[in-house]
């Protein structure tokens, strides 16, 4: 029997927190983590880049289509 499984059977020492469960509990927590990156996208992705950016410089009205 490996030592790690023996240690996990013992109660944690008084100064040490028990290890967290491996899988996240509850649907809400998992959904909230999955939805986190959406508000951050406009900060680090330019609205127009490459050919779109050059086309917007030539014809500014195309930007709002």
UniProtKB/Swiss-Prot annotation:
Name of the protein this chain belongs to: Uncharacterized 7.3 kDa protein in 100 kDa protein region
Residue numbers spanned by region Disordered: 1-30
Bias kind Pro residues: ranges: 10-23
Lineage top rank: taxon: Viruses
